[in-house]
Amino acid sequence: MLKQISASILLLLLLTSLIHAQQREWVKVAPLGAGFSVMMPTRPTEAVESKELFTLHSFVAATGTTLLIAVYFDYAPSMKMNEATELVANRDSFLRGVNARLISSKEIKLDGRSGLEFTGEDERRLYKSRVYVFGNRVHQIASVSLKGDDETGNAERFFASFAFAAITDGQGKP
């Protein structure tokens, strides 16, 4: 009897902590100088990678079996970009990098910035992404989820929360 009560209490504590974890407040991610904000379920893992022609900043968080990704990269000022060409190249490179096939793609705009929304899939995963180009900066947000998982609400919340912000320095000056 004592074992059943202990097991019941343990199960109740586990369920309570899972419910609490799912209901906790999301974190607003607004990196200094990044020019965007987005909500994520946890503090993301941040990485910076510098190459000869660009610098990439990435922010990755997980919720259940879904990964939520926000990246921005700045091309060198010497790079001359065509927005439409860059959007398609980014889409194709993303899908090629994860060995996924394109399912849908459409042009979008947000705050006057040209963008592309696309979805893709491989044998096990679904990919959704939005990419925007403004000058020599590219912003991209993406979700990666397992097929059959019902985590669309988290991905929708993530995508809906993305907003552009003024790019400022450490003192809040443009």
List the predicted regions and their residue ranges.
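Solvent-exposed loop/turn segments at secondary-structure junctions
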Residues: 75-78, 124-125, 146-149
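A short acidic-to-branched-hydrophobic micro-motif
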Residues: 58-86, 140-142
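Short helix/turn-capping signatures at newly exposed starts of structured segments
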Residues: 26-27
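Bacterial N-terminal signal peptides that target proteins for export
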Residues: 1-9
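Bacterial N-terminal signal peptides
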Residues: 8-17
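Signature of long, low-cysteine stretches enriched in small and polar/charged residues
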Residues: 30-59, 91-134
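Boundary at the C-terminal end of the N-terminal hydrophobic targeting segment
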Residues: 19-21
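Surface-exposed amphipathic alpha-helical segments
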Residues: 32, 42-45, 85-101, 139-174
